[in-house]
Amino acid sequence: MAPPSHCHTINGGAPRNGAIPEVETTTSTPAASDTALLLDADEFRRLGHQVVDFIADYYAGLGDYPVHPSVTPGFLRRQLPADAPSRPEPEAFAAALRDVRDLILPGVTHWQSPRHFAHFPASSSTVGALGEALAAGINVVPFTWAASPAATELEMVVVDWLGRALHLPESLLFAGGGGGTILGTSCEAVLCALVAARDRKLAEIGARRIGDLVVYCSDQTHFAFRKAARIAGIPREHCREIPTCRDDVFALSPTALHAAMQADVDAGLVPLFLCATVGTTQTTAVDPVRELCAVAARHGGVWVHVDAAYAGSALVCPEFRDVIAGAEAVDSLSMNAHKWLLANNDCCAVWVAAPSALVAALGTEQEYILRDAAAEGHDVVDYKDWGTTLTRRFRALKVWLVLRCYGVEGLRSHVRSHVAMAAAFEAMVRGDARFEVVAPRRFALVCFRLRSPPERLGVGVGVGGEKAANELNRRLLEEVNAASSGPYMSSAMVGGVYMLRCAIGSTLTEERHVREAWKVVQERATSILRKRG
């Protein structure tokens, strides 16, 4: 990927983004053997200022970078030494920052770019980033209450704060007998919930019947669930992917779920776990939580987990809370605050109605984990028993800072601004007869495609015509993403229909970026159709 056109060169012609300043080189980084300086306050302050300036200038000039790099595999490995230096390099930190600028930044996909529309957001904020820095600087390992009492209790406070901000059922909060924790991703969350459900069920029916357990999802459920099922020992053939259809806006049908569960019961199998999704990755479809919970309850108390990784953030807005109607009956729910709530990667909050099931499945009692006398006689939370890892990060600190500094109203405004921009983009699509919106927009994702010429004439395309229409849209996406300083979008194939995805959610995205993106789409469509005659 070529650097922005306004770049100038340094170091004998190496390209450099003019927005990012030269790095100070007046003091060398202390040698690792000089332990007195490894965490020297003055050195930390000096280098820290350089990093803050570097990041600030990166954000200031981010709009000048192509969103996605045009590089080939091995491009970076060829430019870096095969071995780490045996001794500190001269001016090592400054040299490393220059390499970040000149070698690494040109080869990353700029997820914070205002023109990044390909994926659900990995939202950043000043407070979120500085909260990460603060947690890294304090660097505690809060696996038990005794290991870091304040970190544990802040996490308990934060998950209840966040749960109330999202209007979750009281039964999922510590205040209501449930509880929550902050993990890295929804992949971890669904795995932990599945293991808890598995062990609870096997305690009831016997461990020998693990081969009879069956789990359920839709064909739109994130692949992380299938991976979690394999890790948990569920055979591939016992993971039921229930087909969805366009008539149901790609949501999981309660009727189809009941039929699948009943067929398994009739075959002597044991329904175990349902993963419902609120805001699927491909189209943001919303599974009907209340109705699915009712089906699960009819089949021996199947554990219901709601994956709201993306759309869960929208629950801060009252107008979206209907999407989890019936959630008081779920066993667990997870959402990624790093996707849309300004908390920076990584930050997945998960709540469970019965924490005891989680602790029973994941708890440990090793002697080397020291207990604090102050905790004796108290019902403390040891978060090592709520996840798969012992070492864990102090993620609650940044979430606490985000909630304090932006407030729930600030988060609502943030989400609503993106929803409004998505609505504007949707209106632009509908205003051009050459295009169609393929799936209903619920949040800030617009799924659309270019109609083939027969479709625009009202003629059915048939199987062969559908294939041609899909190829037409594949070409359109390639052309859109190839545009210099243009938008970066992605695709989905749902119900045999290939569509473009425009996911609006970058903290830096403004209305002008959305209008410019649509202009590029229109121009590329015009060019493609003209060439086709």
UniProtKB/Swiss-Prot annotation:
Cofactors, names only: pyridoxal 5'-phosphate
Annotated pyridoxal 5'-phosphate binding sites: 281, 336
Keyword set includes tRNA-binding: no
Catalytic reactions on record: L-tyrosine + H(+) = tyramine + CO2
GO MF annotations, alphabetized: carboxy-lyase activity; pyridoxal phosphate binding; tyrosine decarboxylase activity
GO process annotations (BP): amino acid metabolic process; carboxylic acid metabolic process; tyramine biosynthetic process
Domain of life the protein comes from: Eukaryota
Pfam families to which the protein is assigned, alphabetical: Pyridoxal_deC (PF00282)
Transmembrane residue ranges: none
Region (Disordered): 1-22
InterPro entries associated with the record: Aromatic_deC, PyrdxlP-dep_de-COase, PyrdxlP-dep_Trfase, PyrdxlP-dep_Trfase_major, PyrdxlP-dep_Trfase_small
EC number, UniProt record: 4.1.1.25
Keyword Lyase listed: yes
Cellular component terms (Gene Ontology): cytoplasm
Keywords: Decarboxylase, Lyase, Pyridoxal phosphate
Record-listed N6-(pyridoxal phosphate)lysine modification sites: 339
Family: Belongs to the group II decarboxylase family.
Biological role: Catalyzes the decarboxylation of L-tyrosine to tyramine, which can be converted to the hydroxycinnamic acid amides feruloyltyramine and 4-coumaroyltyramine. Possesses low tryptophan decarboxylase activity.
Protein name, per record: Tyrosine decarboxylase
Organism: Oryza sativa subsp. japonica
Gene: TYDC
